[in-house]
Swiss-Prot record:
Protein name from the UniProt record: ATP-dependent Clp protease ATP-binding subunit ClpX
Keyword tags: ATP-binding, Chaperone, Metal-binding, Nucleotide-binding, Zinc
GO MF: ATP binding; ATP hydrolysis activity; ATP-dependent protein folding chaperone; protein dimerization activity; unfolded protein binding; zinc ion binding
Residues annotated as binding Zn(2+): 13, 16, 35, 38
CDD domains membership: RecA-like_ClpX
GO CC annotation: HslUV protease complex
Residues engaged in binding ATP: 117-124
């Protein structure tokens, strides 16, 4: 109930008791009044409480063992990479909590470079890490970036994607994760500095240096090129975790040559020749990235190196079935919504893995293979209420025969043999 000064006939603030003459403004509510001073005080209390909640949330950074355990739920294999990423992520957010310093020691950022073939899980690892901490996440493609003043995207547009992922909450975006894919495509054409302008190679690496290390960047709110008369969003990149990744095709040869030099003169270098692709990539060093075409200053901003091995047939079969969001589980759930059961035989799963290896697409190509196989049956199922179960076999994958159907009356329709041209 609002207060009324009987002597002067003036309204009072229901919270602090000040009259309308003692404050700048009184806001009326149903039976109450509140002054501008009390409104300001309430705002401060709310902001302080929200700030405390956010601080508590960031301080509950999971330990490396916990991070790796969650990564295991979504990513098959790549144990060494998962361990490296878990430690880097833990150290990065521990550094944020310490304000970038521990006593008189300044703590450097733990930006990450991931080396691995297409479809080995680089993007999935980065996405899962962001999901673990519930921080904004953005993916950018390095091939679309060019130096300022040339046709293409400015590096600041990467930051805009992160700001958009944080619903334009800049403070939240400043603690997010950015994954830059295809980073190997901006390697300069040779190890020696070029006299001519390389607008999508060394020039982009130079442009990325500042935001990787930490700077206050000016980002155009609508993207595109900067114009002198537009307003900019200011974002501090000091606490943004940058992860870059690429296939780095051919880097294994550079590593082999380096390893080969160590055994020259000792008689037998057969050990070097017999190294597996996994062992070769695991031996990668910053100097190999420099030989590939990344400039030393750029490599220096990426202190954590994680190598991912090519996925073999067994790993691809596990990827199809084991993770929480495995593709086979997704398609089973999709058909379940039409009251139809879906089953992939063991040989069908192996065939899917073989096709992905043949196409050199790794895990990335698994979905398109299943989609091609399932297209006809997913087209038919909504119109056929008699189907109870669909069985996909290896012959279905190779295109020799259609899927086997179990009908609700108990009869079985074997997939028709397809004619070969």
């Amino acid at each position: 109930m609002f207060k009324f000064n009987e002597e002067k006939g003036q309204l009072k603030c229901s919270f602090c008791g000040k009259t309308q003459e003692q404050v700048r403004k009184l806001v009326a509510g149903p039976g109450v009044y509140i002054c501008d001073e009390c409104i300001e005080l309430c705002n401060e209390i709310v902001e302080e409480e929200l700030g405390t909640e956010e601080e508590v949330e960031l301080k509950n950074v999971p330990k490396p063992h916990e991070i790796r355990a969650t990564l295991n739920d979504y990513v098959i294999g790549q144990e060494k990479a998962k361990k490296s990423l878990s430690v880097a992520m833990y150290n990065h957010y521990k550094r944020i909590n310490a304000g970038g310093r521990a006593d008189d020691v300044e703590l450097s950022k733990s930006n990450i470079v991931m080396i691995g073939p297409t479809g080995s899980g680089k993007t999935l690892l980065a996405q899962t890490m962001a999901r673990i901490l519930n921080v904004p996440f953005a993916i950018a493609d390095a091939t679309s970036l060019t130096e300022a003043g040339y046709v293409g995207e400015d590096v600041e547009n990467i930051l805009l994607k992160l700001i958009q992922a944080a619903d334009y909450d800049v403070e939240k975006a400043e603690k997010g994760i950015i994954y830059i894919d295809e980073i190997d495509k901006i390697a300069r054409k040779s190890e020696n500095p070029s006299i001519t302008r390389d607008v999508s190679g060394e020039g982009v690496q130079q442009a990325l240096l500042k935001i990787l290390e930490g700077t206050v960047a000016s980002v155009p709110p609508q993207g595109g090129r900067k114009h002198p008369h537009q307003e900019f969003i200011q974002i501090d990149t000091t606490n943004i975790l940058f992860i870059v990744g690429g296939a780095f095709d051919g880097i294994d040869q550079s590593i082999k040559r380096r390893l080969g030099k160590k055994v020259i003169g000792f008689g037998n270098d057969s050990e070097n020749r017999n190294l597996t692709q996994k062992e070769i990539l695991a031996a990668a060093l910053p100097e190999d990235l420099q030989k590939f075409g990344l400039i030393p200053e750029f490599i220096g901003r990426l202190p954590v190196m994680a190598t991912l091995e090519p996925l073999d047939e067994e790993a691809l079969v596990q990827i199809l079935t084991k993770p929480k969001n495995a593709l086979v589980k997704q398609y089973k759930k999709m058909l379940q919504l039409d009251d139809v059961e879906l089953d992939f035989t063991e040989d069908a799963l192996v065939e899917i893995a073989k096709l992905a290896i043949e196409r050199k697409t790794g895990a990335r190509g698994l979905r398109s293979i299943i989609e091609e196989t399932m297209l006809d049956i997913m087209f038919e199922i909504p119109s056929r209420e008699d189907i109870a179960k669909v069985i996909i076999t290896a012959e279905t994958l190779t295109g020799k025969r259609g899927p086997t159907l179990e009908l609700k009356d108990g009869t079985i329709e074997h997939g028709k043999e397809k004619e070969t041209a």
